[in-house]
From Swiss-Prot:
GO molecular function: protoheme IX farnesyltransferase activity
Major localization class: membrane
Disulfide bond sites: none
Root EC class: transferase
UniProt KW keywords: Cell inner membrane, Cell membrane, Heme biosynthesis, Membrane, Transferase, Transmembrane, Transmembrane helix
Protein name per the record: Protoheme IX farnesyltransferase 2
Keyword Cell inner membrane: yes
PANTHER family recorded: PROTOHEME IX FARNESYLTRANSFERASE, MITOCHONDRIAL
Any one Pfam family match given in the protein's UniProt record, by short name: UbiA
Catalysed reaction, written as an equation: heme b + (2E,6E)-farnesyl diphosphate + H2O = Fe(II)-heme o + diphosphate
Length: 295
């Protein structure tokens, strides 16, 4: 056991991705008036909560991970850390993260983090991932919480913008996850995980990817239409979203499903990164947007 194991078991890549969306939500609510001490507390607090969830997930999934090529070398599978130590580590990370959000931000942001944590660890990891084709849908709620946490940490209000962020990022999770399940089809089949491509076929997953990307594109526009983001954000959201939709539609004539799914997955990362950046740098009040339209 080494320091490396303590880092690896938290899934740093997932933490980094969540930090980007936290920042997007935070700067969207800040509207150019950034409290950097609060920002640091929210980023660290959310990262600790996400890390805690990932460690718990590693503990829960160790019987599944050993059957999958991409996860067979994880810390818990390889015996790099005892179950007891991992559970204690996960608990300490969670307590630290929730406490930091509650004390340094506000109870609302801590509550949003708690909801995401319960959905991911309790409903998704412990239950639905193994039992239901709808596990991805339920799990998407946890993946959508980080930008909401960032937004609510500043606004201290669960308003239309917070709802829009929750819907946007939940919708984004679906085609992103289905694409992974397609190019990792053998892994999920070997572990008997009922993701949509395995349970109902790749064609069914392709149809769902197109529908969810379309819904995502429409949802992204609501930040500008609702008066929370500017026209620069709108242009980027529309361009990225429509190209992602075009790419998703191409799945119907793809000769290599795995190659196509990897492209859809890769562009999903670019899309959510671009939107997180743009909603942070091009946030506006409703009055600002109305004045822009009126000119």
């Amino acid at each position: 056991m080494s320091v490396k194991h303590f880092i690896q078991i938290t899934k740093p890549g997932i933490i980094f991705g969540n930090v980007l969306s936290v920042a997007g939500g935070f700067f969207l609510a800040s509207k150019g008036h950034v409290d950097f001490a609060l920002f640091l507390a929210v980023v660290i607090g959310t990262s600790l909560v996400v890390a805690s969830g990932c460690v718990f997930n590693n503990c829960i999934d160790r019987d599944i991970d050993i059957k999958m090529e991409r996860t067979k070398n994880r810390v818990m599978v390889q015996g790099g850390m005892s179950l007891t130590l991992a559970l204690v580590y996960a608990t300490l990370l969670g307590v630290a993260g929730f406490s930091l959000l509650y004390v340094q931000a506000n109870p609302l942001s801590a509550f949003c983090a708690l909801i995401g944590f319960i959905v991911y660890v309790g409903f998704y990891s412990l239950w639905l991932k193994r039992k239901s084709v709808h596990g991805t849908l339920v799990g998407s709620l946890s993946g959508a919480m980080p930008p909401v946490i960032g937004y609510c940490a500043v606004s201290n209000s669960f308003d239309l913008a917070a709802v829009t962020l929750l819907v946007m990022f939940s919708l984004w999770q679906m085609p992103h996850s289905f694409a992974i399940a397609i190019f990792r089809f053998k892994d999920y089949s070997a572990a008997n995980i009922p993701v949509l491509p395995v349970a109902r076929g790749i064609l069914a997953a392709k149809k769902q990817i197109v529908l969810y990307v379309l819904a995502f594109v429409l949802a992204t526009l609501m930040l500008t239409l609702g008066g929370y983001a500017g026209l620069g954000y709108l242009a980027v959201a529309a361009a990225m979203g429509l190209y992602w939709l075009y790419m998703a539609w191409g799945g119907y004539k793809a000769e290599d499903d795995s190659k196509w799914a990897r492209k859809v997955f890769g562009f999903s990362i670019l899309t959510v990164t671009a939107l997180s950046v743009m909603m942070g740098v091009d946030s506006q009040t409703a009055a600002d947007v109305l004045m822009t339209y009126a000119r």
